[in-house]
Amino acid sequence: MRIKLLEQVRAGCKTVAEQATHIQIDVDRIPAYAAALPISEARRPAHDPECHYLNHGDDTAAFFLTLDAINFGSGYFPHLRKHTGRSGYFTVAGCLTAHFKENRPLSARDLIRVNAADCTRIFAQDPSNAPIRELMGLFARALNELGAYLHTNFGGSFTGLIAAAGTSAERLMQLLVKMPCFKDVAQWNGVEVPFFKRAQLTAADLALAFNGKGPGRFEDLDHLTIFADNLVPHVLRVDRILHYPVKLRSRIEAGELIAAGSREEIEIRACALHAVELIKAALNESGQPINAMTLDFLLWNRGQQPTYKSIPRHRTRTLFY
């Protein structure tokens, strides 16, 4: 019997967490930490309407598929020209929203043709900045892949792709990870460790945007894991659930890039994902049913607070977050 994608994610990350040599989970602190989380604050997450193209039907679905195709670049964000008071993610989302409003929604054919110079213009970036040139090239590559995939398999229809998932977030993931830019899988000690961060996040974003209806109706959202990036692990480290060795902390605080696919980088993501699975289990056992997606929103938004933003988090230049 074929193991489902989300079971593969959980199993791979559990294996890494149990054998990790760089990152450790403070399992003993999890029950108290879980009990202290402000769960009520996470019950009704919502997209910021200033930074997301909401309430436009099929064009909103197209917006989120497009946004999540390029929902990466945190390792480049120190070089990103950001909107005042906005993070890298909200800057990118806000620029894409402005393009959809002021020009027109991008079609699959548009995505096939887009290049790095177009991305530099859409996201209002400085083409003389070498890391940003690299990021805009990666954005163009990811958008080209999405456009070609939609054109070849769904007649260029964004909603055709979503409909093919048949109200299953996991099925949508299966469709998305056929594109290389979504195939978020690492190798660790000979073990394949899938994360599929952006593929999972696409389903969650659509569910939020459409209030669980139409293109946002997925019957298995409770099966999603967290969306393993560099912010949720950072929050868990600051909150003393994850422990990093002194040498790694020093590298991160010095702004040194952590190589994509390195043992440290994989362990950071995998241990964060597994730690949230343990937090979820502790909450469920205490009579507070919650899913990993909701915990991700809570922890990610906690990471926007000044306390967390003032402490450097790991930076990795990758297509996946």
Tell me the role of every PLM-derived stretch.
Residues L5, A204-F320:
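Accessory, usually C-terminal, subdomains that scaffold auxiliary metal cofactors
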Residues D184-V185, N189-F195, A199, L206-F218:
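A mid-sequence, solvent-exposed acidic-amphipathic segment
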Residues M1-F196, H243, K247-S250, G303-Y321:
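Phosphate/adenylate-binding glycine loop and adjacent helical scaffold
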